[in-house]
């Protein structure tokens, strides 16, 4: 979707769909991805390229967008790449291959890559060359990057003066590093959701999902104070006074924000007798 002559500039809403068994095998071609070339104004949302897919190209390739070009803002939101990406030349990534001539402003939000990226220079897990005005938010990588000519430890994304907010990579150093245990046990999912379980973007059915996903049919991750779980069995409070006569003296969210009333999700409740309870409101 999108070519050099006719780059995509619309709004694509994937509605959380997953693309399976997409194979692109052309080592003579560039500008390769689910979207080949996009330009300012393009918004790519909520689609995942499944691990059953594979891309092999010459250069400027990624699972979601091969190339951005021209001025304007390009937004890639809620997208995941699980496919392996191999290019014989430069500029490959899981989400974006290259911001050509670094003219576009690129925002990547709530995205992830778990595929292996094999390429030459200016390649990395989330994006090849991003330019100097990009922002990447709430995004993670667990895929292996095998790229020659890496600039130091820039395995997450390539670019200068780019802004990375709440981003994570497996055993990396460009953004916050996480271990394989943190990926599988739910901690990474909880971190991506801002250390809260009320208004979440990432989901993970523990014991089944090897990494956080964007699929709402999977389970929410909670922190019970000692470990990450999908279900909580909190104490119930029917009123502001319990059977011992203790009253509620304070209510906080799990992140520590004081609240006036119980909110949907998990609440930390302090009683007048000094006890503290977790209360789940559905």
Report the location of each language-model feature:
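C-terminal outer-membrane/trafficking sorting elements
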Residues: 234-282
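Surface-exposed repetitive/solenoidal architectures
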Residues: 1-233
